[in-house]
Amino acid sequence: MMSVLFLLVGLGLILSGANFLTNGAAALAKRFNISSLVIGLTIVAFGTSAPELTVSIVSAINGSAELSIGNVVGSNIFNILMIVGVTAVVAPITITKGTLTKEIPLAILSCVVVLICANDVFLETGTENILNRADGLLMLCFFAIFLGYTFAIAHDNTGEEQAEIRPLSTWRCLLYIVGGLVALIFGGRLFVNGSSEIARSLGVGESVIGLTLVAMGTSLPELATSVVAALKKNPEIAIGNVIGSNLFNVFFVLGMSATITPLPLGGITNVDLFYLLAVSLLLFFAGRYYKVRTITRVEGVFMIFAYVVYIGYLIYML
């Protein structure tokens, strides 16, 4: 019972901490005349993936590598199948040409990078499947390239609506930042400890908890944002949230975690990694062929069903 309480309290602290940290950092940056464009592409983008980053890094430091990797892989699968799926059921999603030809292929590339880095035994580059520091640095290099690309295309669309930033006094900005960081760190420890204890009490591997419970919990901000956007007749926001979050999760969150400490895959198998690649390809083909550049309600229902099938597989394999 206490482990569930730790899990819920930890998740609450992570989500609120990410919100306070993002608001404080954005307001402070604005006071130093940093443009809304730069703030949106860096601080706000970081804030939405702060739960995944916190959980994965704390898990890596605690020696729970399967929880760290499972969180990223599971979150990315959840993002595509459930967030896009549910949003499309609420309102069909129109995909821009740039997203279909550039951003989604980048997400597919991130899956391929993880597959290659995680298959040391098959590729005969090692005796154990592990994401080592070299793999982590490679992912961080890809993240730097992605960030540069994001800035480049953003400057070509400077007329588009930019993030609204609530003005705060300097001392309040600092209070938000420090308080947010404390909440993230403390909440991350509670969440990871609670998750690990639940795994032990149920007799299942941390990989399963990471791929399911932890992944769903850390993806709640993106789900809430996307559904609200769909209800306000702006479902296209979901695609941007999902693609940006998935790229951030693989290239930065997983890259940073593996750089801090090598991550053995353990219970994370090629089935999970190939499923992530498959659903990323599904997102591309759904927007490319069935109804050009649109995710329909039918496709949304299929995506939700595909997620249920994946969860069913994980339960069956216990």
Region locations from a protein language model:
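Hydrophobic alpha-helical segments, chiefly the membrane-spanning helices
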Residues: 1-318
